[in-house]
Regions:
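Positively charged, low-complexity terminal tracts
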Residues: 1-71
Length: 71
């Protein structure tokens, strides 16, 4: 049995997509994964990533956001 813990829920203002981040922990131990669930109307996109990929993705998102006009 795996344990799923909700970390954050967001809604994109332009497209209305629902984004949920979840931590996935496996009973046998090992590496936890970050599950990203994106719901767009009745369609779901779900993928699991490792901590290193999550860190690189997060840094890329922050770099992009920091380069955008504020206001």
């Amino acid at each position: 049995m795996t344990r799923t813990t909700s970390l954050a829920k967001l809604r994109a203002p332009l497209g209305g997509q629902e984004i949920e981040l979840q931590q996935i922990d496996f009973d046998g131990g090992g590496m936890s994964l970050l599950r990203t669930r994106i719901r767009e109307k009745s369609r779901f996109t779900v993928f699991d990533i490792d901590p290193q990929t999550a860190e690189a993705w997060g840094q890329a998102l922050l770099r992009w956001a920091d380069g955008q006009p504020k206001g």
